[in-house]
Amino acid sequence: MSDYLSVSALTKYIKYKFDQDPHLQSVLIKGELSNFKKHSSGHLYFNVKDKESVISAMMFKGSASKLNFEPKEGDEVLLEARVSVFERRGNYQIYVNKMQLDGIGNLYQKLEALKKKLTEEGCFDKANKKSIPKFPKKIAVLTASTGAAIRDIHSTINSRFPLAEQIQISTLVQGEKAKDDIIEKIEYADSLGVDTIIVGRGGGSIEDLWNFNEEAVVRAIYNCKTPIISAVGHETDFTLSDFAADIRAATPTQAAVIATPDQYELLQQIQQYQFTLTRFIKKHLEQQRKHVEHLSSYYKFKQPTLLYDQQIQRRDDLEKRLKQQIQATFEQQRHRLMLLQQRYNLKALLSSVNQEQQNNLQLTNQLVKLLNSKILSYKNDLKNKVENLNNLSPTNTMLRGYAIVNKKDEVITSTKDLTENDQLTLTMKDGLVDAKVTKVRCNND
């Protein structure tokens, strides 16, 4: 019986062997998480499996707290672990020290972490987005020199807005050197003074597009002073460069559409503006024509003497009153002189009287001169007004060979108001003429 081992003794021996084997102290394992559970203590319990085998595993709280992602069922992971035996159950398991997502999963994890960081810094804020110029003179295109992307962009811009100059900047969009080349070409394009920059490439896997998720590339796009359109991949592909750009296009073709106006739509707009302006001018001219017709029918223009008859009467009245005032003043002075002659010796006052006469004569001359100046000013002003009114008078117009055409007491101003056999009355400078319309010819005929 002493040759038999107990279960616990065998288990301890096997555990001892595992713990002493240096090859089992730090093992790198690749697999899929299953039966994942997080204990209230903070420890993690799970299985790691592939298509053929399953290993029990656990991760202590201290190591789990250092993870930069939240493990979940189905994650493909890379593990660094120690292999040992769980004595109570007698099965071996691994104790995980480090864990990271495998392949694409790890890339997505890095992508989300960088996206969160740049979002918190404001690199994706809409407030920082620049508007795309509507009528670009120069467009820089950063993409591979060959491939569908450059062909689509080039042909679309040429068909929509051929006035825009395209500056093609050959750029590496995939591979180890692509990141630095993309940054260099963005900075170069920004220095050219172009209106818009298109950064694009065709579709691909997340690994193919990863250069456009690099932090340095995203920051180069964010810091660019020239508006940037990002057209990386297909419609379902998204990169951090899309979020940093001023606008994201689903495809390179759509980027060219966003960057340019449609020349045919512009032509339609110009034609519409031309039609609207022509209609406005015609309407304004018609309004002015009617206004002139209304003024020409005003009775004062038909009888211009009505405008200055009252002014002539007023001038004559003022002239008469002024002369009467001068005469009355003269009579008063003469009567005063006579009284003085009766009261004083005429010989003694002769010198004084002569001086008074000279003063009166001087005042009279000044008054007459002032009167004549005023009368002349009134005459000249009246003459100018009469000449201006005569120039506007229909009578003077008729002296130049024109006539006023009336049909049934209505003034005719257009051939459109006449038909054949209409009876007309022509008012000329020296009389009236009855006429009959035999034919109507318009200027457009």
Swiss-Prot record:
This protein's record includes keyword Protease: no
Keyword field: Cytoplasm, Exonuclease, Hydrolase, Nuclease
Entry's Gene Ontology molecular function annotations: exodeoxyribonuclease VII activity; nucleic acid binding
EC main group: hydrolase
One cellular-component annotation, GO: exodeoxyribonuclease VII complex
Compartments, record wording: Cytoplasm
Main localization (coarse): cytoplasm
Single GO biological process annotation from the record: DNA catabolic process
Listed EC numbers: 3.1.11.6
Pfam families named in the record: Exonuc_VII_L, tRNA_anti_2
Catalysis: reaction(s): Exonucleolytic cleavage in either 5'- to 3'- or 3'- to 5'-direction to yield nucleoside 5'-phosphates
UniProt superkingdom: Bacteria
PANTHER family referenced in this protein's UniProt entry, alphabetically: EXODEOXYRIBONUCLEASE 7 LARGE SUBUNIT
Function text: Bidirectionally degrades single-stranded DNA into large acid-insoluble oligonucleotides, which are then degraded further into small acid-soluble oligonucleotides.
Summary of subunit composition and partner proteins: Heterooligomer composed of large and small subunits.
Protein family (similarity comment): Belongs to the XseA family.
NCBIfam families on file: xseA
Name this polypeptide is given: Exodeoxyribonuclease 7 large subunit
Gene expressing this chain: xseA
